[in-house]
Structures are given as structure tokens and as C-alpha cells.
């Protein structure tokens, strides 16, 4: 089995910029992400797969100084003045592109697109000094679980020592559920799917992952699956059960974080 050189972390990133605005419904999530950042070895770079970028083919940001993409609507003016002036890492981006192509995955460089809120919101919480370079990799538009497991596996041959691979999505993403906290049908679906998902991740059961829509509460927890797909990229890259699972309340719903720690290098 290939040695896992990177720390791999899937997070539920919350609602738009709300985690950065002191929203009460995100306090537990902010504390959780800060705890995770303090627990992990400080990375020299972060590779992010965010739910908020889909393209065909897969694209990789190559800018040395990426801008921010305020890809949310209807929030207070300060939401659009958030700054996170991290650098990019063009050399790492080139290595990712080379590795993906070598593994038969069609991928292109993206020199212009900024980092979306699935990147800068959790990064600002975890690494507020913006002194760790970020590279963002898109999801493919078809959102195929099989493909995104393979996308993660395609990176297994890279030396990602001291790199954090971050899957930024949400283990529950039904907007109606967030706006209807008393909807017991959706609340029950949330709890059922979280239990099923933890079991699937604990077994690294890729066949089950590909059938997530048939899981208890699956379809109601994710009317569209883009927020779940980054988890499958992480699971594909790790190829084994998680090391740590953290569940927190976000806006009245259970939301999960999954962590796979890098392997110790042999002496």
C-alpha cells in the first residue's frame, strides 16, 4: 500500500461567510476547525477541493497571487470585504497537473480564477495569518462518485509531505432543512445519513459510497451532491478508514469532519 504522505481532512465549511461573521449557529464549527488546525502539523501548502467549483475537465489554480471569489449573495457588506491574501503555489500546481495527466485524468491549468469561499472561509479560520500557499482543484461537473474516488487515488503517487489536502464541503446540505429547523423529516434524515456516512468511512467502503443516494436519509441530506463529493476525493486519496471523526452542530444540523493523518515515514 502506498504510504500516505499528506494529512487529509474533510470539513463541513458552513454557510457562506457566516463562520467569519460571528454567527451563533457556527460557533461550534469555528472552534472545531481551530482545534483541528492546532492538532495538525503546520503544512507548507494546502490543496483544496471545494464544493463550489465544478468544471470539465478538472482545473487547477496556477496563480502565484490568487484573488478571492465572493461567490455568495445577500450577505452584509463586510462579507465582500473579507481579505485572505495567501499566495498560490505554481510549482505544486504543475506537479498536480502532471500527476493527474500521468494517471489518465484530463486536467487543465486555471491561471485566472480566484479562490472561492469554500477555500478562504475555512482557511481564514484555521490559518488566519494567510501565510500558507493554497492550490485549488475543481470537481468535475458530472459529480461522479466513481470518478472523484479515482481523482483522489490519482494523487497517491505524489510526495505530499507537509501538505494538507482539504476537502471542503458539507456532510449535510439541504437548504430547506436549514431554513426549517422544525422539519422533523429532514432532521431525522440528517441523523440517519450521518450515522450511515460514519460507518461507510470507518470501513473505507467505496461500494457503499457509490450508493450514497440509497442510504438512509441520503437523498434528503443532499438534494444535489456537490457538497458531499469533496469527501469522496479525500476517501479515494486516503484509501483507508479515517483516523478521527468530529461531529458538530451547524445551524441545528449535525455536520461532520473526517481526518486521515499522514503515515510516519519508516526509519
Regions found by a protein language model. Give the residues of each.
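Beta-strand elements within well-structured catalytic alpha/beta cores of enzymes
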Residues: 7-12, 45-50, 137, 158-171, ...
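Conserved phosphate-coordination/catalytic loops
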Residues: 24-28, 87, 145-149, 222-225
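A short aromatic-anchored loop/beta-hairpin motif
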Residues: 2-100, 107
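Short, solvent-exposed loop/turn segments at secondary-structure junctions
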Residues: 15-17, 53-55, 142, 171-173, ...
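Internal, conserved structured core segments that host functional sites
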Residues: 93-147
